[in-house]
Amino acid sequence: MDTDNSTLPTEQSAVRETCDRDVTMSPRKRRRLSVSLEPELTEPEAAGTPGERCSTADTPESTASEPRSLFNSTPTEGNIAPFLTKHIKDQHASRNRFAPIDSSLPRRKADSKYCYRHRPDLKCRRQAAEPTVDQMQRDLSTLSQNDQQSIAHFWSLFSAAPSKHRNLMLQGIVAQCCFPQLSFLSASVRDLIRIDFVTALPPEISFKILSYLDTASLCSAAQVSHSWRALADDDVVWHRMCEQHIDRKCEKCGWGLPMLDRKRLKDTKRQVQLRAAGKEIAPNQRPQQQHRPWKAVYMDRFKVGTNWKYGRCTTTIFRGHTNGVMCLQFDDNILATGSYDATIKIWDIETGKEIRTLRGHESTIRCLQFDDTKLISGSLDRTIKVWNWRSGECISTYTGHQGGVLCLHFDSTTLASGSKDNTIKIWNFHDKSTRILRGHADWVNSVKLDTASRTVFSASDDLTVRIWDLDTGKCIHSYAGHVGQVQQVLPLPREFEFKHQSNCADDRSDRLSGSESPDHRGSHGYGSNNAPDQQPNTSAPPTEPMSPLFEALFTEDQGRPAPPRYMLTAALDLTLRLWEVHTGRCLRTFFGHIEGVWGLAADTLRFVSGAQDHMAKVWDPRTGTCERTFTGHRGPVTCVSLSDSRMATGSEDSEVRMYSFKA
C-alpha cells in the first residue's frame, strides 16, 4: 500500500507530460483528463476583486469587507501555476479570510505597475457590474459540479494573472473563437471599453479639455451625466468661451458675439457723477452688485448674434421730420436726428415717441453728436451749436467756417469740424483756441478724432483721405485709391482683427440657432444671396510709399501711441475700402451697392453702409461679403448708426428706421 501511494505522483506527472506533448489530442479529451487529475477543490478563499490584481507586483491582502464574487475563487496551493506563485505568493497562502490582517505581511510596493484601468487610485477603475455577475452566477449554477469548478478555476487564474499573462490568455481564447463567439465578444465589450476620462482627471485638466469644444459640443457634453454637466456648466469654461467670441471673431469657428450691454456701466457712472456733485442718491437708485453666470451671458449674446446672422429683427419707424434726415445717433434709450428742415429731434427708442425738438439753426443740419450732457450740431448756416439736449437749451454757438459745416467729431477736450470751405478746424474746449488744417482741394465730408495718438482723419470730395497731426497741424499721410468723392472715413477699434483667409469654414454653432428666418423683403430687407454682390478684392496693391513723417512720429523711441491700425472709407464710386493705416495699403474693396455710398458705421464684428440706391447693407469684415441687405426706404439712405443689438438708418424720405436684434 505504501509503495502504491508513493508511485502515484510519479504516474500523474508522467500522464501530465504526455498530455503536454500530445498537441493533437482533442480539447474534450484534454479537458476530461485534466479534470480527472485535479484533486477535489476546497471552498475558494476571497482574493480581492479582479480589478485590483492586474499588476506585476504583490497584490494587497483581502479584507473581511470584500464581497464574495465569481472571480474570487482561488485554487488550492498544489494547483497554482508557476507565474501565480512567482507574482502573488501571499495571495494563495492558507489563512482564515475573516482573520485580522497581519501588519507584518508584505504590502504592495509604491511603484507597482497597474493596468491603467485597474489602478485603485482612479475613480474610473473597472468593476464587474452587479447584474452581469448575478446573471453569470445563475448560468454557472446550471452546470455540473465539475464544470463549475473548472470554469471558476479558469476565472481565478485569469484574475490573479499579471497583465502580460492576461494578454496571452486572451489571445489564445480569441484565436479559438468562431464567428458567433467573436460577435458575442464584440457586443459585450462595446460599452465596457468606454472610460469616463473627465471624472478620472483633475478638474483643471478637464476644464482645459472642455475649453477646446465649440458651443454645440459643449452643450452635448453637459447631457452625458451629472458630473459632466457640473464641469461643462462651470464659469471657467464659459468665461473662456466668452473671451473667444464676444466683441471679436473666433479664429476657430468664425463666430463673433456683440459686446455686453453697457447700461449697467452707465448707471454706475451716473451714480458716481451724482455723488461728485453732492447730490443725494435714493436707496432704490443705488446700483446693486450682480453677478451673472458666464453661460447666461454667452446665451444672451449668442441669441443676439444669431439674430444678426439671419436677419431676425423688429423694426420701429420714426416719423416727424418734414424733410430728409441727414444725420443721426443713438444710445441705449435716446435717438437724435438732424434734418433738412433745420431741426434736431430727440426720440425715446423704446416707445418711438418724440421727446423734444431743438430749434435754432437757420439751414440744414448736416451733422450731430451727443453724450450724457450735451449735443453738438453742425449746419449749412456755417455755425456749430452746443445744446443741453435734456432741456432743449442752446448753450453756445461757434462760428469761423467760411462755408457750411458738413461734419464734426468731438472728445472730452477737442472738437474737429469739416466744411465746404475745404478746411478742418480744431477747437479746444479748455483754452478756446483754434487751429485750421489746410490741404484738401474740395469739400471735407468726414472727420474723426483719435485721442490716443493725437491725430485726426478726414475724407474729402478731392478723392483722398488724410491723417493729420493735431499737435503741429501737418498732414502725416494722404491715401488715394477711390475714384469717387469720399464721403466717410472711420478708424476701426484697436481690437479689430483682419485676416485674409478664414481659419474655420465649418460653423458647427449654426446647429444651435435653428432654422433660418423668413426672407426680410419689403420693409425688412432681404438676404445677401439676392443682392448683386461681388467677391471682395483681397490683393489690392499699396497706394503709395508711406510718408517718412509717419515713421518719425510713431516709433517706439518717441513713446507716442500709434493711430488705429485699420480704417474704413466709403465713396460715391459705389465701394467701401479697408485700409492699413501705417502702410497706406488698401486691403479689401467691398462691392455690392449699385449707387454711391453716403453713410457708414462699423464695430469689430460688422460694417454697415447706406447708399443712394435706397438700401442699407451689413458686411462681414472677415470675408468681405454682404451678409444682409435691408430695404424699405423710399429715398437714398443718407446716414446709418450701429450698436451691439441695434441698427438705425435715416433717409431723404424723412423717415428713420430702427432695427432691433435683441432676443
UniProtKB/Swiss-Prot annotation:
GO BP terms: protein ubiquitination
Boundaries of every F-box domain copy: 195-241
Extent of Basic and acidic residues compositional bias: 502-522
InterPro entries documented for this protein: F-box-like_dom_sf, F-box_dom, G-protein_beta_WD-40_rep, Quinoprotein_ADH-like_sf, SCF_subunit_WD-repeat, WD40/YVTN_repeat-like_dom_sf, WD40_repeat_CS, WD40_rpt
Pathway: Protein modification; protein ubiquitination
A Pfam family assignment: F-box-like
Protein keywords: Repeat, Transcription, Transcription regulation, Ubl conjugation pathway, WD repeat
Protein family according to the UniProt entry: Belongs to the WD repeat MET30/SCONB/SCON-2 family.
Protein name: Probable E3 ubiquitin ligase complex SCF subunit sconB
Organism: Trichophyton verrucosum (strain HKI 0517)
